[in-house]
Amino acid sequence: MFSAQNKIKKDKNAEPTECEEQVAQALFDLENTNQELKSELKDLYINQAVHMDISGNRKAVVIYVPFRLRKAFRKIHPRLVRELEKKFSGKDVIFVTTRRIMRPPKKGAAVQRPRNRTLTSVHEAMLEDVAFPAEIVGKRTRYRLDGSKIMKVFLDAKEKNNTEYKLETMVGVYRKLTGKDVVFEYPVEA
């Protein structure tokens, strides 16, 4: 019979953690109780889920989804996030696609590394995942006098209602995932 275990598939058949079991159970419950999400959630599963404590009293649940299922998750993203945030009260839910970074090839090696497996490409894609459903309309990198750098990311103002309440969480999650400082803003319309 179907169960919440079918909603999580980890690498090398590793045992799911307590957090991952909670998320899988929530997805399974949504599939069984929510009629509008039932057909879309039927074939979807997750790879990993992590609870993160962000600065202050904010908490987030970061859910990793397989690259193949990225489009399907994005199609139902706003509704799914709304339902999951109800279940995990007080926690922001962020979906991130599972991606791998390959190390640069050794000198003299004949192998080519695909562009989408480079560190830069994976971090940029993670930034898009964290900011979703808002679209990134611009980026500026600011170098400070002490040598540190901070990236300003401008989000599309159309999705302001869906994303504004969790900007602080998005900054904290991106910093924990990549180690880079980022600031999310909405461009000022003149």
UniProtKB/Swiss-Prot annotation:
A GO BP entry: translation
Chain segments annotated as coiled-coil in the UniProt record: 17-50
Keyword Phosphoprotein assigned: no
Cellular compartments per GO CC: cytosolic ribosome; cytosolic small ribosomal subunit; nucleolus; plasmodesma; plastid
Record keywords: Acetylation, Coiled coil, Ribonucleoprotein, Ribosomal protein
GO molecular function, one term: structural constituent of ribosome
Entry keyword Ribonucleoprotein: yes
Positions where N-acetylmethionine occurs in the chain: M1
Pfam family, one: Ribosomal_S7e
Similarity section: Belongs to the eukaryotic ribosomal protein eS7 family.
Protein name: Small ribosomal subunit protein eS7x
Record organism: Arabidopsis thaliana
Taxonomic lineage from the root: Eukaryota, Viridiplantae, Streptophyta, Embryophyta, Tracheophyta
